[in-house]
A protein has these predicted regions:
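Gram-negative bacterial Sec-dependent N-terminal signal peptides
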Residues: 1-21
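Outer-envelope beta-barrel architecture signal
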Residues: 4, 23-29, 70, 74-78, ...
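Outer-membrane beta-barrel architecture
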Residues: 9, 65-67, 117-119, 173-175, ...
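Outer membrane beta-barrel
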Residues: 22-37, 51-191, 205, 214-221
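Transmembrane beta-strands of outer-membrane beta-barrel proteins
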Residues: 28-34, 81-83, 130-132, 185-189, ...
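Structural signature of outer-membrane beta-barrel domains
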Residues: 34-38, 81, 85-89, 134-138, ...
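Detector for outer-membrane/organellar transmembrane beta-barrel domains
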Residues: 204-327, 338-340
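Outer-membrane beta-barrel "beta-signal"
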Residues: 364-377
Length: 377
C-alpha cells in the first residue's frame, strides 16, 4: 500500500508539473495474460516439440506509457508518446530478439522502445521524429481480424515479421490531414540497420523510405504502400550489403454491418536475388453480441534465390485461424483462438501470438491455441 501511494505521489508530481506548463499528459497501458499451448516448434536438433504455459501479451503486448499534448496556439500542438513493454507473467516467457537474445521487456526491444517520439500537429498534418511503428505494420494490423495478436495473427507468416519491420529507429515521418477520406504517410528512416556510423565490415549505412496512401469513407477502406530499404542485401552470403529490398502492399476492407471482410497482398524483391516473396491474407470479422468471431486464411510463398543458384521448391506455407473475443466492458475482454500452419518442404513457420515467437521445422505443421483476458487502462 505504501509503495502504491509513493508511486501515485511521484506520478502526480510529474503530471502536476506538466499540467502547470499547459500540457495534457496521460498515463495508459494494458496487461494481457493467457494460457497457451503450441505444437510443431523446433527443438533445435531438427525435430519438433511442444510448449504449454501462461503467456503475457497474447492478444496485445503488455505495455505502459505516457503520451501528451501541449497547445502552442494558432492550432499548433506539441505531441509526444513514450511507451515500454513489460512481461506481465514474468520474464521466463519464450520471447527473443532476431538474434536470439531474451527480451526483458517482452516487446519493443528495451525500455521505452515500443514507441518513443516527439512531434508537431496542426492543420498541415502531423510531423513526428523518433522510434515509431512502420506503415507496413499498421496496414497489416488494421486488415488482420486478429489485430496482429492472438494465435491466428498475420505476423506468423507475414513479411513484417520476416524482415523485423514492426518498428523503426530514427524515423522522420509526415502524416497528411484527412482530405475527403484520403490520407497519406511519408517517412524516412536514417538507420534501418544497426546505426548511422559506417564500420569496416559494413561501410554502407542502411536507410529506408516509405510512402503510404489510404482512402477511408464509411464502410470502405483501401490503400497502397511502397517501401525501399537500401544497403540491405549482398551479392554473396558474407559480402558487404549494397543491394536494396523493395516491397509493396495493397490492402482493403469492406464493412457490411453483419460482417467485415478484409484482405492484404504484399510482395518483396531483393537485389542480387531472383524471384520474390509474396504473402496474402483474407479475413472475416463477424460481430456476435458483445463480442466477435474472427477468422482468416494466410499464405506465404518465397521463391527468392541468390543469383546463380537454383530457385527453392516447396516454399509455401498456409495458415488457417479462428478466434472469438468477448467484451466485458470498453476496457476488458476475454479471448480464445486457434491456428494451424501447414509448412511446405522449404518453410519452417510456427504459430505464435502478439508476443510469443517461435521457429518451426521445414515440412512439419504447427498449431497453437490460447484462452485469456486483456485489460486496458
Amino acid at each position: 500500500m505504501k509503495k502504491s501511494l509513493i508511486a501515485l505521489a511521484v506520478f502526480g508530481a510529474f503530471t502536476g508539473a506538466a499540467m502547470a506548463q499547459g500540457s495534457n499528459v496521460q498515463l495508459y497501458g494494458l496487461i494481457d495474460a493467457g494460457v497457451t499451448h503450441y505444437t510443431g516448434l523446433s527443438n533445435g536438433a531438427g525435430g519438433t516439440t511442444s510448449s504449454t504455459g501462461l503467456s503475457s501479451g497474447v492478444q496485445s503486448g503488455d505495455r505502459i506509457g505516457l503520451k501528451g499534448t501541449e497547445d502552442l496556439g494558432g492550432g499548433l500542438n506539441a505531441i509526444f508518446d513514450v511507451e515500454t513493454g513489460f512481461c506481465g507473467t514474468g520474464t521466463s516467457q519464450d520471447v527473443a530478439t532476431a538474434g536470439g537474445t531474451p527480451q526483458t521487456y517482452c516487446t519493443g526491444g528495451g525500455f521505452m522502445q515500443r514507441q518513443s517520439w516527439v512531434g508537431l500537429a496542426g492543420n498541415f498534418g502531423t510531423v513526428m521524429a523518433g522510434r515509431q511503428y512502420t506503415a507496413q505494420f499498421d496496414n497489416e494490423a488494421a486488415m488482420d481480424p486478429f489485430g496482429f495478436g492472438l494465435n491466428g495473427n498475420i505476423g506468423n507468416l507475414s513479411m513484417v515479421k520476416h524482415y523485423g519491420s514492426y518498428r523503426a529507429d530514427q524515423v522522420l515521418s509526415y502524416v497528411t490531414p484527412n482530405l475527403s477520406g484520403f490520407t497519406g504517410v511519408a517517412a524516412y528512416v536514417f538507420a534501418a540497420g544497426k546505426g548511422t556510423v559506417p564500420t569496416a565490415t559494413q561501410p554502407n549505412v542502411s536507410r529506408a523510405w516509405t510512402l503510404n496512401g489510404q482512402y477511408g469513407n464509411g464502410p470502405i477502406t483501401a490503400g497502397l504502400n511502397y517501401t525501399d530499404v537500401s544497403n540491405a542485401t549482398s551479392a554473396t552470403a558474407g559480402g558487404v550489403a549494397t543491394g536494396a529490398v523493395k516491397s509493396w502492399q495493397l490492402y482493403g476492407a469492406y464493412n457490411f454491418g453483419v460482417a467485415k471482410v478484409s484482405g492484404i497482398y504484399e510482395q518483396a524483391k531483393q537485389d542480387f536475388y531472383s524471384g520474390n516473396e509474396k504473402n496474402w491474407m483474407i479475413g472475416l470479422t463477424v460481430p456476435v453480441g458483445p463480442g466477435a468471431i474472427l477468422a482468416s486464411y494466410d499464405e506465404n510463398k518465397n521463391s527468392l534465390a541468390l543469383n546463380g543458384t537454383a530457385a527453392p521448391s516447396g516454399d509455401t506455407a498456409k495458415q488457417y485461424a479462428i478466434g472469438y473475443t468477448y467484451s466485458l466492458s470498453k476496457q476488458t475482454d476475454l479471448y480464445a483462438s486457434y491456428a494451424h500452419i501447414s509448412n511446405g518442404s522449404g518453410t519452417a513457420f510456427a504459430v505464435g501470438s502478439s508476443t510469443d515467437s517461435f521457429s518451426g521445422v521445414a515440412g512439419q505443421s504447427s498449431s497453437g491455441m490460447a484462452i485469456g483476458m486483456r485489460h486496458m487502462f
